[in-house]
């Protein structure tokens, strides 16, 4: 019974580690495709707020939330 509990705990830990690592990769890839990363200077608090910020800042195509790196957090990236 003790070995079964240990085996289940190990299995669940592996599943958790794999799911978290995949999430981080998706967050990096999804954020900045097609956008110029030079204009990611403001924290992103939502898609609509980012779009409005970029339009007011002079980027007529708007913007999108993106992350340049995992510890950087999400920034509002404006499109030229």
Curated annotation (Swiss-Prot):
Cellular location(s): Secreted
Region forming the signal peptide: 1-27
Entry keyword Kinase: no
CC per GO annotation: extracellular region
Protein family according to the UniProt entry: Belongs to the DEFL family.
GO biological process: defense response to fungus; killing of cells of another organism
Organism encoding this protein: Arabidopsis thaliana
The entry's keywords: Antimicrobial, Disulfide bond, Fungicide, Plant defense, Secreted, Signal
Cysteine disulfide partners in this protein: 40-78, 44-65, 50-76, 54-77
Entry protein name: Defensin-like protein 46
Highest taxon in the source lineage: Eukaryota
Major location (coarse): secreted
């Amino acid at each position: 019974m003790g070995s079964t509990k240990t085996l289940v705990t190990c299995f669940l830990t592996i599943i958790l580690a794999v799911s978290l690592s995949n999430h981080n990769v998706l967050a990096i890839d999804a954020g900045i495709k097609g956008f110029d990363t030079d204009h990611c200077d403001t924290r992103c608090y939502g898609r609509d707020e980012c779009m409005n910020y970029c339009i007011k800042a002079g980027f007529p195509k708007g913007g999108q939330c993106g992350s340049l790196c995992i510890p950087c957090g999400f920034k509002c990236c404006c499109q030229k």
